């Protein structure tokens, strides 16, 4: 499975689970190294860098993942072989108690 096929599979899963996510399109108008998907589930921010099974993150991608982790978010490189484990993790996070954040409601 190539990275594009895997990305489609992950996005379909996020849509099925009604997970808020944004697909980042790399290019001249965007800062380089931003993870492929920025997501929020049950108050948890996480960033996904999607790779084919033999893919490797660039140093800039690794730098941005580390910055997200240092800021309290979850950031990971996700490979197809980890997808089932990731799906289970998301389903568990959806069942966590909702954080008591102040809102403007």
Regions from the PLM with identified roles:
Residues 1-105:
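Catalytic phosphate/metal-binding cores of nucleic-acid and nucleotide-processing enzymes, i.e., regions
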